[in-house]
C-alpha cells in the first residue's frame, strides 16, 4: 500500500463515521493527519472513534445541508486545530429505487439537497479558510452513476453528475491558487448507500 505523508495536515471528512468515509478517515490517520469526522449520527461517530482509537481523531455533529452550521463548525475546527488543509465531501444518500415518472418530488429534492447542494455549501464555505494559508485539497466523492445514469436511480445519478460538474468548475476557478479540487467516482461498494439502493 502506498504511504502518504500527511503529518501536521488537518482534514475534515463528511459522512466519516462509516463506509467510504470511515475508510478515508482510517487511511488519513495512518498517514499522520489530524482528522475531524463530520456526521449526523453521533452513535456511529462514537463507534468510529472507538474503532480507530487515535488521539488525532475527533468528531462534530454536523448537518451539511445547513450552510450556517457548516460555517460555524469550520470556524470551530480552525480555532481548535489552527487551519483546515483537506476537505472530503463524502456524505450522501441513495434515494429511492424507482422510475422518473414515479419519483416523488419531495424525495427528489431531499437527494439533490444532500448529495449536491450540501457539497456546494461545503466547498463555498471551506475555500476561504484554505485561501488564508495558501493551501488546500478538496475531494468530492461522486459515483460512476453520475457518468452513466443508473436506471431507477435518477435523483442519485443526477446529484452525482452535478458533483462532477461542480468539481470541474471549482477546480478551474482555483487553478492559479494552491488549492486543488478533485472528484472520485467509485463503482458499487458494500456501504450503507449500497444497502439503500438494493432494499
State where each predicted segment sits.
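Active-site helix of classical SDR
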Residues: 123, 159, 167
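Active-site loop immediately N-terminal to the catalytic Tyr-X3-Lys motif
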Residues: 97, 101, 148-154, 176-177
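Canonical Rossmann dinucleotide-binding motif of NAD(H)/NADP(H)-dependent dehydrogenases/reductases
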Residues: 4-35
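The beta1-alpha1 cofactor-binding region of Rossmann-like NAD(H)/NADP(H)-dependent oxidoreductases
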Residues: 42-43, 61-73, 105
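Residue(s) in the substrate-gating loop at a strand-loop-helix junction
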Residues: 143
Amino acid at each position: 500500500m502506498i504511504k502518504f505523508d500527511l503529518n501536521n495536515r488537518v482534514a475534515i471528512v463528511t459522512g466519516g463515521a462509516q463506509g467510504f468515509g470511515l475508510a478515508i478517515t482510517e487511511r488519513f490517520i495512518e498517514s499522520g493527519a489530524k482528522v475531524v469526522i463530520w456526521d449526523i449520527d453521533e452513535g456511529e461517530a462514537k463507534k468510529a472513534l472507538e474503532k480507530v482509537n487515535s488521539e488525532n481523531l475527533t468528531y462534530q455533529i454536523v448537518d451539511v445541508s445547513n450552510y450556517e452550521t457548516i460555517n460555524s463548525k469550520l470556524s470551530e475546527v480552525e480555532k481548535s486545530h489552527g487551519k483546515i488543509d483537506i476537505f472530503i465531501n463524502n456524505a450522501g444518500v441513495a434515494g429511492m429505487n424507482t422510475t422518473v415518472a414515479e419519483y416523488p418530488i419531495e424525495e427528489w429534492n431531499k437527494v439533490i439537497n444532500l448529495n449536491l447542494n450540501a457539497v456546494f455549501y461545503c466547498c463555498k464555505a471551506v475555500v476561504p479558510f484554505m485561501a488564508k494559508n495558501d493551501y488546500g485539497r478538496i475531494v468530492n466523492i461522486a459515483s460512476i452513476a453520475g457518468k452513466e445514469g443508473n436506471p431507477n436511480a435518477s435523483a442519485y445519478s443526477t446529484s452525482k453528475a452535478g458533483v462532477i460538474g461542480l468539481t470541474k468548475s471549482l477546480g478551474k476557478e482555483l487553478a492559479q491558487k494552491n488549492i486543488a479540487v478533485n472528484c472520485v467516482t467509485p463503482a458499487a461498494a458494500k456501504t450503507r448507500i449500497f444497502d439503500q439502493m438494493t432494499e
